[in-house]
C-alpha cells in the first residue's frame, strides 16, 4: 500500500460562459492521466453554475469506459440535492462498470444556488446530509445480509419501506467513502462516524492546521471504537495555470 498517492481532477467546466469541456477533451484527459501514472481521477458536482459544468455521475461513466487501471471517484458528490437512494443506485452501477475502481467523496456542497434550483432548503443541508449518509450505508448493505433483504428507514427527511438496492457495488462490502469537511468539530465527528476517510480542502487549511485536525479526527474515531489504522485522508488542492508564456498564464 502506498504511503501517498496522487490524483487529478477532471476538467468539468469550461472557462467561457455557457461552454463546457468537450467529449474529446474528457476522454483524452482521462487516458493521459492513466498513462502518466496518476492513482486517481475525480469529478465534482454542481447543478447550476456560472459556467458550463458537466454532470458528475455521467462523466464518471464516460471515463470508466475508456480507462482500465486508474481509480475514479467524486470529490465531492452532493447526495442531499441529488437524493441518496438515486445516488446509491448510480454509484453501485459505476462501481460495477469500472470493475471496482470507484471511491466516493460525499458532502452537502456549499452552493446555495444548487439548493434553490433543486427545491431543497439550504439551511437544512447538514442534518439532511447525515441522514443521507445513513441511507447510503444501509442500501449498500454492510451487515452481510442477502441482496434480497428489504430496508425500512424512518428518518426526518428520508423514509424507505421495503426498499432494496440490487445489485450491490462490485467492491465488498462497498466502495470507500470519504466525507468532506472544512474541519469543524461537528464536521469531523460526522467524518469519524460515517467515513472511511476525510476529504479536506486546501481552500481553508494550512499544513499545521491539517495535522491538528487529523489528530482530533483520529481521537474521535477511537472514542467511537472505530479502526484508525485503515482510516485515510485526502487533500484537494487548488488548480493552477502552467505555460512558458507569462501572458497566457495571467
Region spans (language model):
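Hydrophobic faces of well-ordered beta-strands that scaffold small-molecule active sites
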Residues: 6-10, 41-43, 71-75, 102-106, ...
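Active-site-adjacent beta->alpha loops and helix N-cap segments on the catalytic face
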Residues: 52-58, 204-220
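Alpha-helix-loop-beta-strand connector modules within alpha/beta enzyme cores
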Residues: 53-74, 128-139, 223
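Active-site beta-loop-alpha junctions enriched in small/polar residues
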Residues: 9-13, 46, 77-79, 107-111, ...
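Conserved, mostly hydrophobic/aromatic
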Residues: 33, 37, 45, 63, ...
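N-terminal beta1-alpha1-beta2 module of alpha/beta enzyme domains
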Residues: 1-66, 173-175
Amino acid at each position: 500500500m502506498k504511503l501517498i498517492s496522487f490524483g487529478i481532477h477532471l476538467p468539468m467546466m469550461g472557462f467561457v460562459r455557457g461552454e463546457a469541456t468537450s467529449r474529446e477533451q474528457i476522454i483524452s484527459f482521462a487516458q493521459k492521466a492513466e498513462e502518466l501514472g496518476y492513482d486517481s481521477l475525480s469529478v465534482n458536482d454542481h447543478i447550476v453554475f456560472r459556467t458550463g459544468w458537466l454532470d458528475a455521475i455521467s462523466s464518471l461513466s464516460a471515463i470508466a469506459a475508456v480507462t482500465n487501471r486508474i481509480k475514479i471517484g467524486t470529490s465531492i458528490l452532493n447526495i442531499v440535492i441529488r437524493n441518496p437512494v438515486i445516488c446509491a443506485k448510480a454509484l453501485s452501477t459505476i462501481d460495477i462498470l469500472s470493475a471496482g475502481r470507484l471511491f466516493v467523496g460525499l458532502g452537502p456542497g456549499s452552493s446555495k444556488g444548487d439548493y434553490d434550483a433543486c427545491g431543497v432548503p439550504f439551511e437544512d443541508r447538514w442534518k439532511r446530509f447525515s441522514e443521507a449518509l445513513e441511507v447510503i450505508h444501509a442500501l449498500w448493505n454492510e451487515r452481510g445480509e442477502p441482496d434480497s433483504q428489504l430496508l425500512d428507514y424512518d428518518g426526518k427527511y428520508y423514509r424507505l419501506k421495503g426498499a432494496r438496492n440490487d445489485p450491490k457495488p462490485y467492491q465488498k462490502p462497498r466502495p470507500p467513502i470519504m466525507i468532506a469537511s472544512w474541519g469543524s468539530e461537528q464536521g469531523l465527528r460526522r467524518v469519524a462516524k460515517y467515513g472511511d476517510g476525510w476529504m479536506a480542502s486546501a481552500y481553508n487549511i494550512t499544513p499545521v492546521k491539517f495535522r491538528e485536525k487529523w489528530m482530533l479526527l483520529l481521537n474521535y474515531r477511537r472514542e467511537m471504537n472505530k479502526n484508525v489504522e485503515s482510516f485515510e485522508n485526502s487533500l484537494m488542492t487548488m488548480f493552477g495555470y502552467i505555460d512558458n508564456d507569462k501572458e497566457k498564464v495571467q
